[in-house]
From Swiss-Prot:
Annotated segments matching region Transcription activation (acidic): 1-44
Protein name: Cellular tumor antigen p53
Record-level GO BP terms: B cell lineage commitment; bone marrow development; cardiac muscle cell apoptotic process; cardiac septum morphogenesis; cellular response to actinomycin D; cellular response to gamma radiation; cellular response to glucose starvation; cellular response to UV-C
Domain notes: The N-terminal and C-terminal disordered regions undergo liquid-liquid phase separation (LLPS) following homotetramerization and activation. Post-translational modifications, such as phosphorylation or lactylation affect the ability to undergo LLPS. The nuclear export signal acts as a transcriptional repression domain. The TADI and TADII motifs (residues 17 to 25 and 48 to 56) correspond both to 9aaTAD motifs which are transactivation domains present in a large number of yeast and animal transcription factors.
Organism listed in the record: Macaca fascicularis (Crab-eating macaque)
Residue numbers covered by motif Nuclear export signal: 339-350
Length: 393
């Protein structure tokens, strides 16, 4: 059966158009061309045209048109440069070192301390030999103020801590970071201050703007009736061994008497150690101080050799004790005890005779005792004989 031939006059449906017909529908300057089209070139502005367009004043007809245009985009701000890391915090250095020299002044200002021992239970003790106070953390440390005459009205007493060693004197003494964060403030003292005053509402805590040093100031009060001195109770709020704080560096407390204008009237100082067992530490340091303070032989001026001791003998000569020439009679019960005491006495007599300490009168007596000893020992002596065997010659 033959298939019916298609009529050429009948157009195929749209989906059946050929590729050539679709290609003819594309524009001549298509996007696949490797060269930019002329229309795109017309839209591009040269740098000269752009500068001229920006410098020309808009005409009356173009002004409304430009106002209707959208505002230009604001330039994107440049990314901020990262800030340099902050330097590590360091201890502030003071521009001056307070003097620690004792100055009694015209008012005879001096310090006093209560007498206390070296027991383990003591919380604060003072060593006169070392001029040093040993105390526990945040415990009461009474300091007595003595004067010969009353200072002028408005006088003040200032307490300041400095490091004792010269290589640390310029550093400001302050608490360690751990104790600064502790909630032990009384509402008056800044957390970084080491020294506080106990039981005085008129206390002032000062931070010097020039030297950055911390100090605590209280008004001077004359002694009460029946008392010869004024007592101030101080507290030390950080241990001497705290890392980040004093760090085992010795400190001095300087107490100054000032007038209302800040002029110095008197000065005194003492060393302080804040520790867990003040009595034990004081006893140890005093023993070491006494060992170091033993008298040594001084060298003559201009001599480079070590001075020899006056006594050149290698060993000290024993002191001769006078012997007692009296004789005593001792009654002893029992033969065994008598023999034991007699042998002990003979041994002592023999020792004295060998050392040459026995007087001449007692030597005859000792020889008589030796003869008696020989007789007594022969009584109990057993003679040993060699047994002759068959092989002996």
């Amino acid at each position: 059966m033959e298939e019916p031939q298609s009529d050429p006059s009948i157009e195929p449906p749209l989906s059946q158009e050929t590729f050539s017909d679709l290609w003819k529908l594309l524009p001549e300057n298509n996007v696949l061309s490797p060269l930019p089209s002329q229309a795109v070139d017309d839209l591009m502005l040269s740098p000269d045209d752009l500068a001229q367009w920006l410098t020309e004043d808009p005409g009356p007809d173009e002004a409304p048109r430009m106002s209707e245009a959208a505002p230009p985009m604001a330039p994107t701000p440049a990314a901020p440069t990262p800030a340099a890391p902050a330097p590590a915090p360091s201890w502030p250095l003071s521009s001056s070192v307070p003097s620690q020299k004792t100055y009694h002044g015209s008012y005879g200002f001096r310090l006093g301390f209560l007498h206390s021992g070296t027991a383990k239970s003591v919380t604060c003790t003072y060593s006169p030999d070392l001029n040093k106070m040993f105390c526990q953390l945040a415990k009461t440390c009474p300091v007595q103020l003595w004067v010969d005459s009353t200072p002028p009205p408005g006088s003040r007493v200032r307490a300041m801590a400095i490091y004792k060693q010269s290589q640390h004197m310029t550093e400001v003494v302050r608490r360690c970071p751990h104790h600064e964060r502790c909630s032990d403030s009384d509402g008056l003292a800044p957390p970084q201050h080491l020294i506080r005053v106990e039981g005085n509402l008129r206390v002032e805590y000062s931070d010097d703007r020039n030297t950055f040093r911390h100090s605590v100031v209280v008004p001077y009060e004359p002694p009460e009736v029946g008392s010869d001195c004024t007592t101030i109770h101080y507290n030390y709020m950080c241990n001497s061994s705290c890392m980040g704080g004093m760090n085992r560096r010795p400190i001095l407390t300087i107490i100054t008497l000032e007038d209302s204008s800040g002029n110095l009237l008197g000065r005194n100082s003492f060393e302080v150690r804040v520790c867990a067992c003040p009595g034990r530490d004081r006893r140890t340091e005093e023993e070491n101080f006494r060992k170091k303070g033993e008298p040594c032989h001084q060298l003559p001026p201009g001599s480079t050799k070590r001075a020899l001791p006056n006594n050149t003998s290698s060993s000290p000569q024993p002191k001769k004790k006078p012997l007692d020439g009296e004789y005593f009679t001792l009654q002893i019960r029992g033969r065994e005890r008598f023999e034991m005491f007699r042998e002990l006495n003979e041994a002592l007599e023999l020792k004295d005779a060998q050392a040459g300490k026995e007087p001449a009168g007692s030597r005859a007596h000792s020889s008589h005792l030796k003869s008696k000893k020989g007789q007594s020992t022969s009584r109990h002596k057993k003679f040993m004989f060699k047994t002759e065997g068959p092989d002996s010659d």
